[in-house]
């Protein structure tokens, strides 16, 4: 038998080792009987839970899940409030419980941080509501049928509205755009009546490191205060529940035939269905490269408005249908039906002989409700982008004959826009931040004077998205991924497209392409795509070189393949591009900074002198006779 033979071999090995050394092992203090293999019993009629264990019981491995740990922390905080009404002592009890669970290895200190206090508040409200509903149900009639389950589910949307800051405080008006890492919505604050832009980023499968990186970068963005940077107001995190099918099996439905590959790759929340995305942060919508591959990597339509409507019909286990809509490019309404697997907590009969057979049902993968984090970033509303301005300039340039009669083509206007852009880039580079996705769509013109505002910073956690995002197409071939190539094709530097390391000089390449587009009107989109693509090979339009030689020179310098040879934002501000006006402004800014430092130093010296004088006066008062 295996157990006996293994023990015999082990004894022979020990004996050989002892003989080689020449030492005799001392007799054991307690002589235990030799272990033999367990006798075999006929357990065919014994329930599985009562059968004899033949191996040590393996403890289940609990994978680190931020959402689960946040819920556990919220439960601890809720219990602390229930058992200790005093707010101060309740807070102390909560901290003590967290420390205890951290020592036991059940929690991470990260999930107990104050950054998630608002999220825990939402959990506590939901827990309170759930307890009240359960208590009312038990008090009414505990022996009734399961019809109350449908009532509880019908309250899910209302409960989400009660615990959502976004739904409570803001009225969503329209969608402004789809970025690489989320969607931006135009909203109105219900309290002050002002309009804002809120970017919603769906975080899927977040780990501790990922969440810390997101929070750290949000804090960095909050510290950016500059006239040429989109104003940042606040940020918060909420829980959202998304119905995701683990491994979707293609079902032959007529409604699925009209769906494109791009639409079929995401569900109603824009969550990717690729299996490799489970171990990394996944943001709503597709990656920038996949999103822009059909427009900005080739030819981009000026009137390109991505609006889709798709109807998702979700079969609930009670037989009800839940519908959600999303617009499609051609404006048509399409339907997609997903059959949800049964919930283990609720007994149900989920068979239908008319619509599908048992074999079809067994082929479907179970669908689970996953809870993800949604990051909300409230920003200043800027509706006019530089892309819109350039498109209008190109249209008017075809109509205007005299440049003086067409301010959109005037060099002075383009120079003013480019100067403010470079000043904003100089500021963020001075703060140690690389934008990584500078393009006309991410640059805005605000107010009547059309002040330049740089926005839509590509979060560095986008690198986390791309680590394991090796998507696979339908036919099994590897789909193009972005990896570390963050940016849009026409404006991204060569090192970004090659996936190598990049720094602030990568932003300067994008600045060079934007400089060319500001001073070179295009008649067609094909012409624009050809010219901007030719810049990579060092080809500058002859018309630009003749009309604006200084701008053409710096376009050539900024788009060099060697990143170290590109001028910095500071060098641009000190160049002849702005006829020394930028240099004067920069000098004044540096003087103001120096003066502020001197003022701070003088304040410190004055405070020290006042303290010294106070000590001297006290000593003198002590020496005076009574």
From Swiss-Prot:
The modification Phosphothreonine is found at residues 481, 483, 488. Synthesized in an inactive form that binds to the N-terminal domain of CDC37. Has to be associated with a multiprotein complex containing Hsp90, CDC37 and PPP5C for maturation and activation by autophosphorylation. The phosphatase PPP5C modulates this activation. Homodimer; homodimerizes in presence of heme, forming a disulfide-linked inactive homodimer. Interacts with DELE1; binds both to full-length DELE1 and processed form of DELE1 (S-DELE1) in response to stress, leading to activate its protein kinase activity and trigger the integrated stress response (ISR). GO terms for cellular component: cytoplasm; cytosol; nucleus. Residues 1-20 have a biased composition (Gly residues). Residues 170-578 form the Protein kinase domain. The gene is EIF2AK1. It is found in: Cytoplasm. Belongs to the protein kinase superfamily. Ser/Thr protein kinase family. GCN2 subfamily. A motif (SIFI-degron) lies at residues 88-107. Its main location: cytoplasm. This is Eukaryotic translation initiation factor 2-alpha kinase 1. ATP binds at residues 176-184, 199. It catalyses: L-seryl-[protein] + ATP = O-phospho-L-seryl-[protein] + ADP + H(+); L-threonyl-[protein] + ATP = O-phospho-L-threonyl-[protein] + ADP + H(+).
